[in-house]
Regions:
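Active-site bordering "gate/hinge" segments
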Residues: 1-368, 388-450
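A translation/RNA-centric and nucleic-acid-associated enzymatic feature enriched
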Residues: 366, 370-373, 382-383
């Protein structure tokens, strides 16, 4: 195949990601000149919608940003506004919130592992073809996902866009007897989750390495989900006990700066002037030592090293293994919360408004999610700022694409054709599990060769 002159290849949509976008790849003389992730969905203006609304409305409004991870938006919005109002939610209410968040982690990560990501490792175009060859694995993944959905339905009222979450807690909290059936289901899901780790650990992983900074929440003593402070592992740091640098969430916007680029309706983020990665690989690097013991053992057996001694995984293709370990952890954590549950004396604490600004960050399944709100004395919102994980990862995805395509072009064998490069780019993007709708939806691919 000749690659002289310009070559253009377009796909209407990238399968197995949430949303739509385009990728523009420019290659000159076997050198990648440019890789652009073009997010072209119309801006959704959620931040503008929130201005002028009451301070109790963001949990319901922001949950509509994403149908896969609505709890992340609800929890982060609640914490930011509660912080502005000087209110702390702790005890059983905080544990119930963490349980709800575990439910979302379980369902979202299981969906990505089994339906979106795993088909790539078998050369299948979708989970339907994968199920013909590995029916038991796909059914196992669906059982795990259903267990996560059951938590969200019980605590949130429904699995998609929960309606039981409010400032200060919940509209209604469950009795212990209502959580007992969840525990039985989760015990089965825990066995399934550990088996999933063993399954994905046996995949064939291409060599790859993301050498940029990693950003995740850090909550010493436990794996950060709904709490902690932002922490950074430096670029290039590996499994050598590399130090982690933290900063207060109130300083997030001093370190993470968003900028507009012509080719995307999502803002592109930089951490202290550099592209960076948030999500499962970052969480594992920053907090892996605090995984549940069963998840720790599974990580070691899966070849991820020993997170208790600071093991780091920087191969984006192996992110599927880290996500499977996180599912095992979330199931075990959910069981811990249910087993220790004592109902709170009331379903929520009052959150009276005051003129103030508050910010918060939590770990959505796809990475760190940041919210900031300002309000007037009557609770009317005067400012809303939301920085979703996929928008933060956009520059890192483009960097990763350039490196992986360049590695293939430099490799031995026949020159890579457009079809092969397209498949490689799609896999590379799916490694990061982007939720493109949250960020502003992949793949129109344009390859220019000259």
């Amino acid at each position: 195949m000749s690659h002289r002159g310009s070559r253009v290849l377009r796909l209407d949509a990238l399968a197995r990601v949430e949303g739509e976008a385009a990728l523009h790849l420019t290659v000159h003389d076997r050198t990648v000149a440019e890789a652009q992730l073009r997010i072209y969905e119309p801006p959704r203006f959620f931040e503008a919608f929130l201005v002028g609304r009451g301070h109790g409305e963001p949990p319901d409004i922001t949950s509509r940003i994403c149908g896969i991870c609505p709890v992340a938006y609800q929890m982060t919005a609640c914490q930011a506004i509660e912080r502005a109002c000087g209110v702390t939610v702790d005890g059983p209410l905080a544990e119930l919130r963490r349980l709800l968040y575990c439910g979302e982690w379980i369902e979202s990560q299981s969906l990505h592992i089994h339906l979106l990501h795993a088909p790539d490792f078998f050369g299948h175009p979708s989970a339907v073809e994968l199920a013909r060859e590995h029916r038991g694995a796909v059914e196992r993944g669906l059982r795990i996902k259903q267990a996560g959905n059951a938590i969200m339905e019980r605590l949130g009222g429904r699995a998609i866009h929960p309606i039981n979450v409010r400032l200060g807690g919940f509209y209604r909290v469950p009795a212990p007897a209502e959580l007992a059936p969840l525990a039985e289901r989760l015990r089965r899901a825990h066995d399934d989750a550990l088996e999933t780790v063993r399954w994905v650990a046996g995949f064939d992983f291409p060599d790859a390495d993301y050498d940029g900074p990693l950003l995740a929440m850090r909550d010493p003593g436990r794996y950060a989900i709904d709490s902690g402070t932002p922490a950074v592992m430096a670029a290039g740091a590996g499994s050598d006990g590399a130090p982690v640098r933290g900063f207060p969430v109130a300083e997030f916007e001093r370190h993470v700066v968003e900028r507009q680029v012509p080719h995307s309706t999502a803002l592109v983020s930089e951490l202290d002037g550099h592209h960076y990665l948030t999500g499962s690989l970052a969480r594992y690097a920053v907090s892996g030592r605090w995984l549940h013991p069963s998840a720790l053992d599974a990580a070691r057996a899966a070849g991820l090293g020993d997170p208790a001694t600071g093991a780091v995984c920087r191969n984006p293709f192996r992110s599927i293994v880290v996500r499977a370990v996180e599912v095992a952890h979330a199931v075990a954590e959910a069981l811990r919360i249910i087993d220790a549950y004592e109902p709170p004396s009331r379903p929520y604490v009052a959150v009276p408004p005051r003129p103030a600004t508050g910010c918060a960050a939590t770990e959505a399944p796809r990475g760190l999610l940041y919210h900031r709100y300002a309000m007037a004395a009557d609770g009317t919102l005067t400012l809303a700022r939301i920085v979703p994980p996929t928008a933060q990862n956009q520059a890192a995805i483009e960097y990763d694409l350039r490196r992986q395509v360049q590695s293939r072009l430099d490799g031995p064998g026949e020159p890579a054709g457009d079809e092969e490069l397209t498949a490689l780019c799609e896999r590379a993007v799916r490694n990061h599990d982007p939720c493109i709708s949250c960020s502003a939806h992949f793949l129109n691919l344009t390859v220019e060769r000259g």
